[in-house]
């Protein structure tokens, strides 16, 4: 079991993810520079948080053209597991692997706090360890985390059981309290909260550990 962590210019949570996968779960982890295209030997790929390419134009708008992401499209289409955290979620929507968009928070401020969450679906392997309606708390840290989509897209997400996580107390104005969604196949998960920051009691909780432990199965 080997995990790939994509590193863009401007990423700042890649080492946090690597610590969670290697330091907490003892999983071999390979850092993937944005210009790489070889994903062979990887069982899952994580797109970490940060400010890829400085978030110029729009969050994730430039990152979508990175060579590594062209390979990721093929990886995901073949059932490879992909996790996009915060900026990684934004990149996945820009790439078209997940629908909708992440826009400025409703209050127009950067939000950094612990967020209560509810598991809305365990259809994806990433969340099966929690159980339906489970509650957890994960840190959030974003200025553009407000999930938005058309009414038709929202209905599709609801009908296909693709809404994975909802906020217990909506911090940013996301439609339907959405904190994370999956693709219809369930192998791609994008979320704004940071599970890698909640894997070690020393850093404030372990609610994110079960999500990353899904990589062991």
UniProtKB/Swiss-Prot annotation:
TM annotation in the entry: none
Quote the pathway field: Purine metabolism; IMP biosynthesis via de novo pathway; 5-amino-1-(5-phospho-D-ribosyl)imidazole from N(2)-formyl-N(1)-(5-phospho-D-ribosyl)glycinamide: step 1/2
Q: What is its main location?
A: cytoplasm
Name any Gene Ontology BP term.
'de novo' IMP biosynthetic process
Q: Which residues form the signal peptide?
A: none
Judging by the UniProt lineage, the source's domain of life is Bacteria
Q: Where in the cell is it found?
A: Cytoplasm
Matching entries from PROSITE patterns are given as: GATASE_TYPE_1 (PS51273)
UniProtKB keywords? ATP-binding, Cytoplasm, Glutamine amidotransferase, Hydrolase, Ligase, Nucleotide-binding, Purine biosynthesis
Domain Glutamine amidotransferase type-1: where?
2-217
Question: Which positions are catalytic residues?
Answer: 86, 194, 196
Q: Which HAMAP family match?
A: PurQ
Question: What quaternary structure, including any partners, is listed in this protein's UniProt entry?
Answer: Part of the FGAM synthase complex composed of 1 PurL, 1 PurQ and 2 PurS subunits.
What is the official name of this protein in its record?
Answer: Phosphoribosylformylglycinamidine synthase subunit PurQ
Q: Which organism is it from?
A: Synechococcus sp. (strain CC9902)
What lineage does the source organism belong to?
A: Bacteria, Bacillati, Cyanobacteriota, Cyanophyceae, Synechococcales
| Gene from which this protein is expressed | purQ
């Amino acid at each position: 079991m080997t995990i790939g962590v994509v590193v863009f210019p401007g990423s700042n949570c890649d080492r946090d993810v690597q610590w969670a996968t290697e330091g907490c779960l003892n999983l071999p982890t390979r850092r993937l520079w944005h210009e790489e295209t070889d994903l062979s030997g990887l069982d899952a790929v994580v797109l970490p948080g940060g400010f890829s390419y400085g978030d110029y134009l729009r969050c994730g708008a430039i990152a979508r053209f990175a060579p590594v992401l062209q390979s990721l499209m093929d990886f995901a289409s073949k059932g490879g597991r992909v996790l996009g955290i915060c900026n990684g979620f934004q990149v996945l929507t820009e790439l078209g692997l997940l629908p909708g968009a992440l826009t400025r928070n409703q209050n127009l401020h950067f939000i950094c706090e612990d967020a209560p969450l509810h598991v809305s679906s365990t259809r994806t392997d990433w969340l099966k360890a929690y159980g339906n309606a489970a509650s957890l708390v994960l840190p959030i840290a974003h200025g553009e985390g407000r999930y938005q989509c058309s009414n038709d897209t929202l209905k599709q997400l609801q009908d296909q059981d693709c809404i994975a996580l909802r906020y217990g107390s909506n911090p940013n104005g996301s439609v339907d309290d959405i904190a994370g969604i999956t693709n219809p196949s369930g192998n791609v998960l994008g979320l704004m909260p940071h599970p890698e920051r909640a894997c070690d009691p020393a850093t404030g909780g372990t609610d994110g550990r079960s999500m990353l432990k899904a990589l062991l199965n």
